[in-house]
Every structure is written in C-alpha cells, then in structure tokens.
C-alpha cells in the first residue's frame, strides 16, 4: 500500500510539472523611443488591466529600440522617426501608431514667442547667435539637443534641413534632460516631444502656429513626426505580443492615445 501511495504521488507531481511547463507566461517587452514614454505606458497599463499580462518598456532611444528588434532582444521596438531604407532592407517593418509634434522650447522668461523654420535652422547651425537677432533680449543663444541616435533629433533636423550641421552646447540622452536644461538656462533653446512638454518651459509658435493636437492633426504645425511600432518581417510575435500589437493599433485605443497628447492615425 505504501508503495502504491508513493507511485500515485509521483504521478501527480509529474503531471503538475507538465501542466506548469505548458503554461506560458504572458509577457510583452518593448524598447526604444523616450518620446513615446507617455503614450506607450498608457497603452501598456490599459493592456495589463484588460489581459492580466506583464508589459515592460525600456526607454533607451529610437536607435537602440530599432537595434533591439533586429537583434531579437525585445518583442516590439519603438521609434519616433520613420525607418530608414537600410533598416527596411534588413527586414524591419514599421506601423505608425500616432503623430507627435516636436515642440521648440525656450526658458519661460524668454520674450521670443514665434520663430520661422528658417530662423530655427539659423539658430541651431550657429548663423544666429544672439536672441536680439530674432526679436529677443540681448543674450547668447545656447542650443540644447538630443544624442545622435535620437528619433526626436532625426525628426527635428530633417524638418529644419540641419542634418549634421547643428551646433549643440549639450547633446542629452532623454527628453526629460532637455526639458531640465532649458528650464535652468534663460538663454537656452531646445526641442522636445510635444506630449512631454511641461510648464517649466515655454513652447513657442513656429511660423505663427502653436503646437497642439488640432494643429498637428491638420498639418498646420510644421514640426511633427511619427510614433512607430517596429517589428521584424517574417518573424511571428508571441501570442501576447501580437495581442498587445492588435490592442494598440485598434481604433478602440484612440482615446488612450489622444489622452497621452498625441494624434492617433487609426
């Protein structure tokens, strides 16, 4: 009898181990753009609440997120710029989630309220070096920007035609760092995701148009870029990652996306 009981217990334990092995943990990992932090966290929280899955976001910057997808170290990459032709040639594919404005930000005490694209380009390339040259008070302009792999920097320089020509006092690794730097220097100017801007800085108009959801949506605000989900062609997402992808790109998620300060495309 004792031997029989031991055999039954062994069988029960074996079956339990099989059952545990068959149960896949529901996890989706994302990596990339710091500009997308607000919207991706909002989507992730809603997804976890609805499904009970675990959602992770690693804020490393667009370039690193794109590389993570290519290397297979995350499920979905996050980019605040379009994929380049060479990245698409490597089998990466983009799905546009939303459109975000790139706000041109200055210190709250700065009297300049509006600049043209041409003036912005002249400032960041060092042709214009004093605020008095663009209608402001006398003071040397201090340009703050993002690091080279940043999607925000790529979008800003592409739109202003300043690729490889900007003269930065500091190249910072996150949007939050740019906000802080601009808020602490009365002569600073920088750029940041419109959805990330706080009242510690002033977002100026560009060509007479202020950045807002309405002006980004109708295209009248010129400095804007996409928020992109990056996946790898021919590589199936896990069941949970695909579930999140479908959740984030469905029209039902538009309210969440809009509440995060960006314009949904679906």
Regions found by a protein language model. Name each.
Residues 1-4, 8-9:
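Positively charged n-region of N-terminal signal peptides that target proteins for export
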Residues 4, 21-266:
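Exported/periplasmic ABC-transporter solute-binding proteins
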Residues 16-19:
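C-terminal motif of bacterial Sec signal peptides marking the signal peptidase cleavage site
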